[in-house]
Amino acid sequence: MINALPPNHSDTVRRIVADMKSRPGPLLEVLHAIQSELGYVPDGAVPLVAQGLNLSRAEVHGVVTFYHYFRRTPPGKHVVSLCRAEACQSMGADALAEHAKRKLGVEFHQTTADGEISLEPVYCLGNCACSPAAMVNGRLYGRLTPERFDAMIAERGQKK
């Protein structure tokens, strides 16, 4: 499970832990900060976080693996987040998700073989009036159809 981190990643993790360890219950905040800076929470960060926060490796690993939000591998160049909430489901999000998986050749929480696109589920983007919705690299899309999804992906240089 534990892999060595590059020195620059180790320094980043140590800095984040040092900056936040005095806050009450800092583990989630620390993990979010690590993912924000590195794009994911590497397995090699677990012992550094555990040591810095005086927790067991099992406690830190348990939190990282419990919350689907935390990535344990580097994300693709583009992150496509498909809304899975009820409003979007009622407007065809399930069919859109199946189309996206086929189009990209991945399941949720996976990245295309070329490292370009990661497909992630989210539970409400706040765009319910324009469902089904997705977000790509922070840009919100609404009223998606399979055709509009394909065009959205093509904008990213992904022409499958």
What are these regions (language model features)?
Residues M1-K160:
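Signature of N-terminal electron-transfer/Fe-S-associated modules in redox systems
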